């Protein structure tokens, strides 16, 4: 951002005599031009044309060229005619003076009205309400912006909390899934062990059946042998043991042993089955609990994802609202800056108009004073003052230099003119 100032100055010379220089001539030739006043609508842009009156006296013996005192009292027909002509011209001149005074008064009224309407005023009370409204708008905008920033911060913190919770729940979910994978592997191992035990039981059953069949074959064979060898031999030896009884006892022993083995096998099998059944039940319960936990965790994750998505949407909407608000207030600030620049330009224009009107008023006042001095001179001529000096008739030539300095201030941002203001200063010398 840079500032550039350019100063333009112009000078003009205001003053000088509104009369032509007096010189000796054969006749008294006054020349005059009536003043005219032209004003635009609203009293602005007034243009004033001041009459210039010059008179060249003759018939006074060429006294205006080098004589300081002129005696107007003398005899002769030429002097009477000259005085009569002078009186007539003075009457017309006084009439013009009255018209100029009336025009001057009218112009003063217009200047006063214009000054009251558009002139600089020290009463800034009408602008206080606008300033207070603008301050209130700026304060409300700042407060709303702070609230939006606070809401965004709260939403960001809530999103961070939900992200942390989501990561924690995700870690728990991963650990539970790992436990479930381990339990599934354990269930597979248990199923393999159960199948092996079932196969072993089947093999033991087949072996038991084979043993029973062999035992039955042995018993049958022994019975057949006993039946075939039924020979009665009587000796004096002591009475032999009863083979049937012995076989019965053997059969009973074998049956008891087989039954014992069968009972042992059944007990062992039943214990193994019960043990594996308990383990399977425990594994099944753990699997059901893990499945329910996984289902709950999935529902929790879904709800957290939905809530996170809603928070993201809310954050996006808040950011969009913030951008829209910033853009709107930037436009409003730009409009207010343009209004302030326009008011500054209008103030500069009003000051320039006031200075110009003051200069015009001063010029009119100088003209009026010169006209009054000329009227006073004519009155002295009419009264026949013998001590009339030519320098009294010739108005004093005053030269006034008016220097106008125009200062232009431009505010440049990135090579573009953002604001521009003009300040006009009038210097008199």
UniProtKB/Swiss-Prot annotation:
Region described as Coil 2: 247-385
Annotated site location: Stutter: 329
Region (Coil 1B): 131-222
Chain segments carrying region Linker 1: 115-130
Keywords from the UniProt entry: Coiled coil, Intermediate filament, Keratin, Phosphoprotein
tRNA processing keyword on record: no
Alphabetized Pfam families for the sequence: Filament
Annotated region described as Linker 12, given as residue ranges: 223-246
Tail: annotated segments: 386-429
Family, per entry: Belongs to the intermediate filament family.
Protein name per the record: Keratin, type I cytoskeletal 18
Organism in which the protein naturally occurs: Xenopus tropicalis
């Amino acid at each position: 951002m840079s500032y550039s100032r350019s100063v333009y100055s112009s000078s003009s010379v205001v003053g000088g005599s509104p009369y032509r220089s007096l010189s000796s001539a054969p006749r008294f030739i006054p020349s005059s031009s009536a003043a005219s006043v032209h004003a635009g609508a609203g009293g602005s842009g007034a243009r004033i044309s001041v009459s210039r009156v010059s008179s060249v006296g003759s018939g006074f013996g060429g006294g205006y060229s080098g004589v300081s005192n002129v005696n107007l009292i003398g005899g002769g027909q030429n002097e009477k005619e000259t005085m009569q002509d002078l009186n007539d011209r003075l009457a017309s001149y006084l009439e013009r003076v009255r018209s100029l005074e009336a025009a001057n008064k009218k112009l003063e009224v217009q200047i006063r009205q214009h000054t009251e309407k558009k002139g600089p005023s020290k009463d800034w009370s009408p602008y206080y309400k606008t300033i207070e409204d603008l301050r209130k708008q700026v304060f409300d905008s700042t407060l709303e912006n702070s609230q939006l920033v606070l809401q965004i911060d709260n939403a960001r913190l809530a999103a961070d909390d939900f992200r942390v919770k989501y990561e924690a729940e995700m870690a728990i979910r991963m650990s539970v899934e790992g436990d479930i994978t381990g339990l599934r592997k354990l269930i597979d191992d248990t199923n393999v062990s159960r199948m092996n035990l079932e196969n072993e039981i089947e093999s033991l059953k087949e072996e038991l059946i084979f043993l029973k069949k062999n035992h039955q074959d042995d018993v049958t064979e022994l019975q057949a042998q006993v039946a075939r060898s039924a020979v009665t031999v009587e000796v004096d030896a002591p009475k032999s043991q009863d083979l049937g009884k012995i076989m019965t006892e053997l059969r009973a022993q074998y049956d008891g042993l087989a039954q014992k083995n069968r009972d042992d096998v059944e007990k062992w099998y039943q214990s193994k089955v019960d043990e594996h059944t308990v383990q399977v039940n425990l594994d099944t319960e753990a699997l059901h609990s893990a499945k329910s936990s996984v289902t709950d965790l999935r529902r929790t994750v879904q709800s957290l994802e939905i809530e996170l998505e809603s928070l993201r949407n809310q954050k996006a909407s808040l950011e969009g609202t913030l951008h829209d608000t910033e853009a709107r207030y930037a436009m409003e600030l730009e409009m207010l800056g343009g209004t302030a620049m326009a008011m500054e330009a209008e103030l500069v224009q009003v000051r320039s108009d006031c200075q110009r009107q003051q200069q015009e008023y001063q010029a009119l006042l100088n003209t009026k004073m010169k006209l009054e001095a000329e009227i006073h001179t004519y009155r002295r001529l009419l009264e026949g003052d013998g001590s009339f000096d030519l320098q009294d008739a010739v108005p004093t030539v005053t030269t006034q230099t008016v220097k106008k300095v125009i200062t232009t201030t431009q505010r440049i941002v990135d090579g573009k003119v953002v604001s521009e203001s003009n300040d006009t200063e009038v210097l008199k010398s």
